[in-house]
């Protein structure tokens, strides 16, 4: 099972402040079990955003809904309740769910409300492709909902390496270059300016660099105790 924690209300509000109509979309699977992103938490976060006072008098229109599993594209495709004129989706799913929803409703921006943290075991026969490593500090709002940690063979944060050719990965040539995917996704969204932003050096402690991690449920939607 994938475990995720709610981002701070301030970070969430800042990430969606430019949009006028937002769908807050929960997930009925892992994050429901860990009390971070189910129907109850989705409704609670929507209420908290509306009354937060963090939008400077320009409060967006918020609507909410829940998909059984955001990480399964066929289930996301059956979701027919995206309101007209929706400008962005605020996803309460893990990084896999955020990226699946973004692929399904492209080029609609999909913003993560959670930080995916770590994974539990699930014994199920099937095939999965890794798109999230649970780094604990989700950057998908800056990369077009495509994870450079998991989908770049070198986990680069500053663009493609010199070996990327024709949109393919230097290490695994059958795979697309993650940063080429990020570039074209942001281009479709008219958000190439995000590639010019300067970010602080990466802190890998939330990814487990400080030893085994413990999650304690407290506060709204299971946000971690500070």
Explain the meaning of each model-derived region:
Residues 91-95:
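N-terminal glycine-rich "phosphate-gripper" loop used for MgATP/nucleotide binding
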Residues 1-66, 77-89, 103-142, 146-226:
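Iron-sulfur (Fe-S) cluster-binding modules
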Residues 69-70:
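Membrane-embedded and interfacial regions of multi-pass energy-transducing membrane proteins
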Residues 97-100:
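Short, well-ordered alpha-helical microsegments
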């Amino acid at each position: 099972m994938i475990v995720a924690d709610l981002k701070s209300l301030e970070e969430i509000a800042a990430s969606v402040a430019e949009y006028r109509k937002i769908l807050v979309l929960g997930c009925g699977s892992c994050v429901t079990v860990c009390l971070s992103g189910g129907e109850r938490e989705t409704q609670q976060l929507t209420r908290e955003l509306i009354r937060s006072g963090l939008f400077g008098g320009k409060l967006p229109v918020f609507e909410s809904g829940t998909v059984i599993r955001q990480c399964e594209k066929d289930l996301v495709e059956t979701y027919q309740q995206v309101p007209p004129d929706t400008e962005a989706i605020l996803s309460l799913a893990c990084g896999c769910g955020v990226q699946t929803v973004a692929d399904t409703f492209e080029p609609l921006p999909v913003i993560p409300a959670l930080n995916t943290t770590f994974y539990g075991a699930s014994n199920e026969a099937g095939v999965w492709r890794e798109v999230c490593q649970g780094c604990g500090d989700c950057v998908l709002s800056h990369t077009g909902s495509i994870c450079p940690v998991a989908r770049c063979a070198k986990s680069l944060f500053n663009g493609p390496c010199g070996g990327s050719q024709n949109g393919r990965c230097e290490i695994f040539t059958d795979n697309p270059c993650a940063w080429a995917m990020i570039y074209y996704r942001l281009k479709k969204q008219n958000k190439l300016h995000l590639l010019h932003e300067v970010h602080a050096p990466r802190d890998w402690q939330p990814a487990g660099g400080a030893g085994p991690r413990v999650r304690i449920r407290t506060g709204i939607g299971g946000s971690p105790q500070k």
